């Protein structure tokens, strides 16, 4: 009984990474851009219906809802070869099409005005599922639509579907470059509050690290958005392979999440992927083995979140799940795990077991692959707090000077005061404190002393 998942794509970034994700899924399941199963795709052992449903004429349609407050990206999707793939009723563009102007408050208050139309689409999609497991939200936290409308939808999804899982793929802004969005720290922090309180699991896609990986590992001089988005879609599709090619473990979303998130608030995950090569020459000199893949996944340069080195805190892994695809002998997995533990290649929390889980997954039979084995690591690691600290520092600089506040004052939520910002700042600070506490043996009793 497959548990269905509805994908919500929000704003420019969300729709771009969502588009790449569906292109990748179609390729992996042998579905043409029009949604028709290719003639060679006769294996039949994959579960297409977790992410797709079939129309009356048998062609496949993504369980996706495309939302944006300005039309550019969605129009480009509708002018691509994949235009016929989507259900046109599941596309929502705001009528005045002016976007949210990179302003969280504008995205949030537009959410209040249009949420009924959006939830008509989401409810219809949910009613069409036999046993809906949850929602996956793709968005960025820096702009206006993905952050503001995204925050509003996260709150409402919790109210409307309290028992369904909400997982997000959240793109964090590139910290190495000057941003063209001056209010980015405000947008990010206000969204982080909702990601902390209203999501069950957040897969952090950090543009800073993705750019580094593209330049250092893939040798692309100035990586374009579409190249970065391909990296992201690789991660998204790899993290859902066990749902789409089910084995005996981790074949639903809750199974994936439960092994990684032992305590509810610490649910921000980082990912690593290997082997990352675009050129065939490297592929021909390296024999990818399970140990090789698992060891590489633990190297910081393969991790898609750039965290600063923090000398004071002894950061550690809370849990790791490695999804290994390809020709794998299960006994090799056991040996690799032993070797990782013996050599102490990973530093784990002092208050719980060293949890490294491995899920073996088949590769798509329809995609040629240069490597025998590839792996995705999803890790819950306390150093992710440094990403939030960076956002807080930038927020504090602007907040102290009350810079750019007038853009926010226009909206109802900030008309009288900026309490919402200050509460968000406190909640993110509590999250950072809890990640720091999780590195210490007394974490189990953390939070009980303060009451």
Curated annotation (Swiss-Prot):
One biological process term in Gene Ontology: meiotic spindle organization
Location in or out of the cell: Cytoplasm, Cytoskeleton, Microtubule organizing center, Centrosome; Cytoplasm, Cytoskeleton, Spindle
Modified residues (Phosphoserine): 131
Protein keywords: Cytoplasm, Cytoskeleton, GTP-binding, Microtubule, Nucleotide-binding, Phosphoprotein
Binding locations of GTP: 142-148
Domain of life assignment: Eukaryota
Posttranslational mods: Phosphorylation at Ser-131 by BRSK1 regulates centrosome duplication, possibly by mediating relocation of gamma-tubulin and its associated proteins from the cytoplasm to the centrosome.
Main location per the UniProt record: cytoplasm
GO CC terms: apical part of cell; cell leading edge; centriole; centrosome; ciliary basal body; cilium; condensed nuclear chromosome; cytoplasm
Quaternary structure (record): Component of the gamma-tubulin ring complex (gTuRC) consisting of TUBGCP2, TUBGCP3, TUBGCP4, TUBGCP5 and TUBGCP6 and gamma-tubulin TUBG1 or TUBG2. TUBGCP2, TUBGCP3, TUBGCP4, TUBGCP5 and TUBGCP6 assemble in a 5:5:2:1:1 stoichiometry; each is associated with a gamma-tubulin, thereby arranging 14 gamma-tubulins in a helical manner. Gamma-tubulin at the first position is blocked by TUBGCP3 at the last position, allowing 13 protafilaments to grow into a microtubule.
Role played: Tubulin is the major constituent of microtubules, protein filaments consisting of alpha- and beta-tubulin heterodimers. Gamma-tubulin is a key component of the gamma-tubulin ring complex (gTuRC) which mediates microtubule nucleation. The gTuRC regulates the minus-end nucleation of alpha-beta tubulin heterodimers that grow into microtubule protafilaments, a critical step in centrosome duplication and spindle formation.
Sequence similarity: Belongs to the tubulin family.
The protein's name: Tubulin gamma-1 chain
Lineage of source species: Eukaryota, Metazoa, Chordata, Craniata, Vertebrata
């Amino acid at each position: 009984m497959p548990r269905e998942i509805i994908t919500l794509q929000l704003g420019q970034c969300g729709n771009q990474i969502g588009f790449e994700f569906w292109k990748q899924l179609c390729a992996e399941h042998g579905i043409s851009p029009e949604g028709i199963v290719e003639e060679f795709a006769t294996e039949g052992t994959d579960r297409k219906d977790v992410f797709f449903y079939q129309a009356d004429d048998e062609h496949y349609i993504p369980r996706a809802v495309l939302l944006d407050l300005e039309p550019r990206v969605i129009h480009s999707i509708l002018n691509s070869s994949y235009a016929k793939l989507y259900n046109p009723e599941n596309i929502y563009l705001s009528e005045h099409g002016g976007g949210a102007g990179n302003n969280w408050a504008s995205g949030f208050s537009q959410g209040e005005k249009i949420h009924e139309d959006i939830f008509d689409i989401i409810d219809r999609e949910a009613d069409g599922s036999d046993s809906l497991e949850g929602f996956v939200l793709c968005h960025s936290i820096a702009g206006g639509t993905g952050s503001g409308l995204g925050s509003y939808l996260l709150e409402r999804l919790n109210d409307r579907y309290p028992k369904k899982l909400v997982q997000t793929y959240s793109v964090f802004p590139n910290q190495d470059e000057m941003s063209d969005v001056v209010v980015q720290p405000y947008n990010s922090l206000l969204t982080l509050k909702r990601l902390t309180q209203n999501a069950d699991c957040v897969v952090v896609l950090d543009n800073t690290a993705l750019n580094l990986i593209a330049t250092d590992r893939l040798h692309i001089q100035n990586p374009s958005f579409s190249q970065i988005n391909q990296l992201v879609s690789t991660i998204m599709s790899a993290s859902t392979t066990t749902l789409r090619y089910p084995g005996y473990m981790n074949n639903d979303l809750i199974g994936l999440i439960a092994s990684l998130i032992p305590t509810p608030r610490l649910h921000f995950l980082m990912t690593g992927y290997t082997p990352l090569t675009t050129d065939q020459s490297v592929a021909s000199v390296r024999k990818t083995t399970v140990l090789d893949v698992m060891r590489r996944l633990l190297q910081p340069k393969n991790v898609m979140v750039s965290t600063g080195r923090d000398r004071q805190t002894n950061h550690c892994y809370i849990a790791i799940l490695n999804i290994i695809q390809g020709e794998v002998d299960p006994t090799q997995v056991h040996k690799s795990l032993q070797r990782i533990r013996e050599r102490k290649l990973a530093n784990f929390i002092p208050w719980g077991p060293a949890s490294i889980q491995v899920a073996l997954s088949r590769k798509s039979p329809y995609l040629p692959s240069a490597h025998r084995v590839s792996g995705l690591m999803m890790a819950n690691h306390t150093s992710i707090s440094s990403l939030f600290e960076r956002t807080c520092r930038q927020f504090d600089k602007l907040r102290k000077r009350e810079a750019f506040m007038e853009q926010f004052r226009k909206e109802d939520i900030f008309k009288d005061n900026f309490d919402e910002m200050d509460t968000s700042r406190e909640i993110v600070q509590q999250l950072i404190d809890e990640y720091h506490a999780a590195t210490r043996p007394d974490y189990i009793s953390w939070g009980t002393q303060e009451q």
